[in-house]
UniProtKB/Swiss-Prot annotation:
This is Large ribosomal subunit protein P1. Residues 84-99 have a biased composition (Acidic residues). The gene is rpl12. PANTHER family: 60S ACIDIC RIBOSOMAL PROTEIN P1, LARGE RIBOSOMAL SUBUNIT PROTEIN P1. It comes from Pyrococcus horikoshii (strain ATCC 700860 / DSM 12428 / JCM 9974 / NBRC 100139 / OT-3). Signal peptide: none annotated.
Length: 108
């Protein structure tokens, strides 16, 4: 994770994300850099617009949270009423079954 943080730090200060700069940031943080991981990260970030990726990653969270709450509340009240009706009907059915079971025991 520290490799990604180092890349984001370099990006935020406007420095080029390359092997040399990543090594310097990691060493300054007390991390012993691994060449393979640094090369893989630099290759993976090549051609990637980091600002755009950050914006896309943050955007759905804010957008998805607001609309999801409104429909859930409206539908939740209707569902609760339907569930209460269904429970009452089930209780009535159970009561009738218990009554019939009691009668069958009398005439068994």
């Amino acid at each position: 994770m520290e490799y990604v943080y180092a890349a984001l730090l370099l990006h935020s200060v406007g420095k080029e994300i390359n092997e040399e700069n990543l090594k310097a940031v990691l060493q300054a943080a007390g991390v012993e850099p691994e060449e393979a991981r640094i090369k893989a990260l630099v290759a993976a970030l090549e051609g990637v617009n980091i600002d755009e990726v950050i914006e896309k990653a943050a955007m759905p969270v804010a957008v998805a949270a607001a609309p999801a709450a409104a429909p859930a509340e409206a539908g939740g009240e209707e569902k609760k009423e339907e569930e209460k009706k269904e429970e009452e009907e089930k209780e009535e059915e159970v009561s009738e079954e218990e009554a019939l079971a009691g009668l069958s025991a009398l005439f068994g």
